[in-house]
Regions:
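Short, basic interhelical loop/turn and adjoining N-cap
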Residues: 119-135
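Short, Lys/Arg-enriched anionic-surface-contact patches
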Residues: 85-105
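RNase H-like nuclease fold core
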Residues: 133-174
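Short, structured interface segments
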Residues: 83-91, 130-140
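Short, amphipathic alpha-helical "recognition" segments used to contact nucleic acids or chromatin
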Residues: 101-116
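Mobile genetic element proteins and their domesticated derivatives, centered on retroelements
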Residues: 29, 40-43, 79, 109, ...
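Short, conserved DNA-binding cores of transcription-related domains
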Residues: 1-86, 91-92
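Residue-level detection of the helix-turn-helix DNA-binding "recognition helix"
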Residues: 45, 126, 137, 141
Length: 174
C-alpha cells in the first residue's frame, strides 16, 4: 500500500505496509518502521542491536463501513555499550502508551459522541462501551480542568444551612 495513503488516511508516517489481509468485514494492515533506529537515545553511540519484536494491533479509522486493524511489528532495541542499559521498544508515533487505538480513531470517537450516546457510538464502531468511555474520559481530562474551589471556605468547620424547595407543590422540604 502507498505510504502517502497510510499517512493521509490514518496518520501513519515513517511506516511501510508490508501486506494487507481481508477477513470478512475487517481489513488488517501489516506495518513496520521504514528506518531502523541507529543511535542509542541514552548514550548517543551507534551500538544498537535488534533484541526481538512484538506484534501489536491498533484500531484505525473505518473506511467504507469496514473495520481497520493496524498490525505493527514493534522492534525492541538494546545498546551494547559498556555502562549503558538501554533496552526498549521503538516509539509508536500514532498511539499513546498501551492504548489499542490510534489518535485519529480516538478523535473520530469524540466526534461521534457529539451527536450520539456512548452505547450508539460503541455499536456503530463495533467496539466495547468501556473503550468508548475510556476515550471520552481521556478527552475530557485533557481539555477541561476540574472546577476550582478557591472561593469555598473549609466546610468542615462551618455549619451550612441548605433550603430545598419543591417547586411543583411550592413547599419547603428542609
Amino acid at each position: 500500500m502507498n505510504s502517502s495513503f497510510l499517512y493521509h488516511a490514518w496518520g501513519l508516517y515513517s511506516l511501510e505496509c508490508t501486506r494487507e489481509e481481508y477477513k470478512g468485514n475487517t481489513i488488517i494492515l501489516h506495518v513496520q518502521s521504514k528506518k531502523p533506529q541507529k543511535t542509542c537515545p541514552k548514550c548517543g553511540k551507534c551500538n544498537l542491536v535488534k533484541n526481538g519484536y512484538r506484534t501489536r494491533d491498533f484500531l484505525g479509522l473505518p473506511i467504507g463501513g469496514k473495520k481497520i486493524i493496524i498490525r505493527m511489528k514493534v522492534q525492541r532495541y538494546k545498546c551494547k555499550c559498556d555502562g549503558c542499559d538501554y533496552d526498549q521498544q521503538e516509539n509508536i508515533p500514532f498511539a499513546t502508551g498501551s492504548c489499542s487505538y490510534t489518535h485519529r480513531f480516538a478523535k473520530h470517537v469524540v466526534d461521534l459522541l457529539r451527536s450520539m450516546t456512548l452505547k450508539d457510538a460503541a455499536a456503530r464502531l463495533d467496539i466495547s462501551w468501556d473503550m468508548v468511555k475510556e476515550i471520552h474520559s481521556r478527552y475530557l481530562e485533557s481539555h477541561y480542568s476540574p472546577p476550582s474551589l478557591d472561593g469555598v471556605e473549609c466546610m468542615s468547620q462551618n455549619y451550612y444551612l441548605f433550603i430545598i424547595n419543591n417547586f411543583d407543590y411550592l413547599l419547603k422540604i428542609w
